[in-house]
């Protein structure tokens, strides 16, 4: 079953609960920049997120350089944001806990 695209009010409500996630200018995706203590921590984060993404059958667009992981989430089938994006965002936030230096949270 195809996920349903969220309306602006539902997106705003979801974002209000999420720390650090930003709505893209076009309203069709959310993004967050994660910074870790080391490359190993960034890679461990990505590995944990990859397993979560597989379970949800929803995959991020991400970019990694050393200790930085920039993530963009959207649901291409719905041409916008769905509950899947916010579920994966929450899983990513959980995976990042304890891996990021306090000054980078």
From Swiss-Prot:
Pfam entry (one): Pterin_4a
Keywords: Lyase
GO biological process, one term: tetrahydrobiopterin biosynthetic process
GO molecular function: 4-alpha-hydroxytetrahydrobiopterin dehydratase activity
Catalytic activity: (4aS,6R)-4a-hydroxy-L-erythro-5,6,7,8-tetrahydrobiopterin = (6R)-L-erythro-6,7-dihydrobiopterin + H2O
InterPro entries assigned: PCD_sf, Pterin_deHydtase
CDD domains: PCD_DCoH_subfamily_b
E.C. number(s) listed in UniProt: 4.2.1.96
Similarity remark: Belongs to the pterin-4-alpha-carbinolamine dehydratase family.
Full protein name: Putative pterin-4-alpha-carbinolamine dehydratase
């Amino acid at each position: 079953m195809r996920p349903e695209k969220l309306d602006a009010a539902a997106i705003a409500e979801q974002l209000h609960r999420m720390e650090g996630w930003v709505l893209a200018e076009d309203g069709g995706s959310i993004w967050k920049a994660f910074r870790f203590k080391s490359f190993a921590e960034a890679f461990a984060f990505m590995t944990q997120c990859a397993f979560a993404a597989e379970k949800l059958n929803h995959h991020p667009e991400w970019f990694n350089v050393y200790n930085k992981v920039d993530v963009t989430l959207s649901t291409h089938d719905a041409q916008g944001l769905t509950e899947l994006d916010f579920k994966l965002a929450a899983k990513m936030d959980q995976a990042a806990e304890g891996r990021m230096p306090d000054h980078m949270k």
